[in-house]
Amino acid sequence: MHTQNDSSGLPSIAAVVSHDVTDFDTWQRAFDGSSAARKGAGIVAAHVNRDAANPNQLSVYLASNDAERLNAFLSSRDLMGTMRDAGVKGPPAIAMITPVEDQTVKDRPLAGAIVRHEVQDFAIWKRAFDGDSDARRKAGIIGHAVNRGLKNPNLVVVYLQAESVDSLRAFASRPELKAVMTAAGVIGAPDISFVTGGAWTN
């Protein structure tokens, strides 16, 4: 099992690009074909997630160490043309995030959950998240990543990995989770997307 947990090796910035596609296989071929363009733009890692209920709804994670080059890539006409030709439906939603911790499993595709919520204080929330590690492990959560919103650092985006979506759904619906999140200072109800993750590439 390969995980990355050295914070010094984290990329400095990342984008989560969400959109629907007409046909995933067509889109995947175009995505694979643009690998050189991503590398040329300074993107060091890419990970595609497909919504568990709607496999043509995608969330694409792109990591970089150069915010200017990443933004230029995301706003380029070449990318817009590639996405259009790949069957992307409508304009993508782009969320810029700052990676904080990466303990994801990268040696095989896994089910995932993308959890988004605001917190009152990130440090307090992180202590509570770390304190819940045994519960995650017992629930079959084998990998995770923590990110903060670039414009709003109290917006937290957590990526959880397990062998099955059912394990993630069971963890998210456990009765005590609401109390844990309330004590951690989570504001409002979290937004949770269950996904199937693909291979990690660049």
What is each PLM-predicted segment?
Residues M1-N202:
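Short S/T/G/P-rich N-terminal loop/turn motif that feeds into the first structured element of a domain
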